[in-house]
């Protein structure tokens, strides 16, 4: 469960985030909708402890994200392609992420199987670095890498950005199935 308590973040005079109290429970799927600059990405960065709050805190399963890093073991996230290591191939990157979570190569290969249709023969086996992929395929790599270790908490910022309509439909189905299977 995520608990947000009196969370505030300002950039100069602009208040980007101001949340008195909010809870997100195990199994909830939540989408944030708002105008550009409304603070959605800032909120995600605060939840993931990538930004320091001016006031308040975020806890994940009763762990204050700014004081302890244990929550990272059961959290997957993709905010933008800055999360990717662009001098690796997708395969190398997936194996690297898997290794961070104690997964063997065979386990990573098995966990990639449900994403074959999503990758549509455009990601694996291309023998090129991530930096040379289209924005849509980088988005796919990021989403898959966030889900690879079957996290309890999955945070995806604008997951449909750069994806064609077919890929958007596939990932919506995969996210729904993931939530049903893992919560």
Describe the residue ranges of each PLM region:
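Conserved structural motif at the start of ABC-family nucleotide-binding domains
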Residues: 2, 17-19, 72
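Hydrophobic anchor residue at the start of the ABC signature
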Residues: 143
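Helix-to-loop junction immediately C-terminal to a conserved catalytic motif
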Residues: 48
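Catalytic Walker B motif of ABC-type/P-loop ATPase nucleotide-binding domains
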Residues: 154-158
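The feature captures the beta-strand-to-loop junction immediately N-terminal to the Walker
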Residues: 33-35
């Amino acid at each position: 469960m995520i608990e947000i308590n009196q969370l505030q973040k300002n950039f100069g005079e602009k208040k980007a985030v101001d949340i008195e109290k909010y809870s997100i429970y195990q199994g909830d799927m939540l989408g944030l909708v708002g105008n550009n600059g409304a603070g959605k990405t800032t909120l995600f960065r605060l939840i993931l402890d990538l930004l320091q709050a001016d006031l308040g805190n975020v806890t994940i399963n009763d762990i204050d994200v700014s004081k302890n890093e244990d929550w990272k073991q059961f959290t997957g996230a993709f905010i933008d392609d800055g999360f990717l290591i662009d001098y690796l191939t997708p395969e190398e990157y997936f194996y690297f992420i898997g290794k961070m979570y104690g997964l063997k190569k065979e386990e990573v290969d098995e966990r990639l199987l449900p994403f074959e249709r999503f990758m549509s023969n455009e990601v694996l086996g291309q023998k090129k670095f991530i930096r040379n992929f289209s924005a849509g395929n980088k988005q796919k790599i990021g989403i898959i890498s966030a889900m690879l270790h079957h996290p309890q908490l999955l945070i995806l910022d604008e997951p449909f950005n750069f994806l064609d309509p077919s890929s958007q439909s596939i990932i919506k189905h995969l996210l729904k199935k993931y939530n049903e299977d893992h919560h």
